Curated annotation (Swiss-Prot):
Residues 1-89 are annotated as: DNA-binding. It holds the Pfam family FUR. This is Ferric uptake regulation protein. Coiled coil: none annotated.
């Protein structure tokens, strides 16, 4: 999916907030910045040790917690699996979760967004935030 936005420089934002950017944190930030999938903590750990085998799983968990607290990443708890993560930047999108493979596909639909707004408004509400997850199986050819 082409993303028509520039990802913010979370490293600079974290520095301004007084967070030390260690080599492991930089590696983990880069993994989350460059990925198009939604890795779980173990996958982030696997990718991190490819770059620096001194990074521990506990370092990954602590860094994820810090990044989440600072608003740099979003945690997704898709049904039937571990928490998965993505950078918090960018345009709003929803997710399709392939129930067979666990793959996550991002999508955006103006029709769906408009319909949600209409439904909320008709019931006397204004949407502040929402998250749409569609659990699907691939169509058979």
């Amino acid at each position: 999916m082409n993303k028509p936005y520039t990802k913010p420089d979370y490293e600079q934002e974290l520095r301004r907030a007084g967070v030390r950017i260690t080599r492991p944190r930089r590696i983990i930030l880069n993994i989350l910045n460059e990925t198009e999938d939604h890795p779980d903590a173990l996958e982030i750990f696997r990718r991190a040790v490819e770059e620096d085998d001194s990074i521990s799983l506990s370092t990954v968990y602590r860094t994820i917690k810090l990044l989440e607290e600072r608003g740099a990443i979003h945690r997704h708890a898709f049904a039937g699996g571990p928490s998965r993560f993505e950078q918090a930047s960018g345009a709003h999108h929803d997710h399709i979760i392939d129930m067979d493979s666990g793959d996550v596909v991002e999508f955006h639909s103006d029709k769906i967004e408009k319909l949600q707004e209409e439904i909320a408004r008709s019931l006397g509400f204004e949407i502040v935030h929402h998250r749409l997850e569609l659990y699907c199986k691939k169509l058979k050819s």
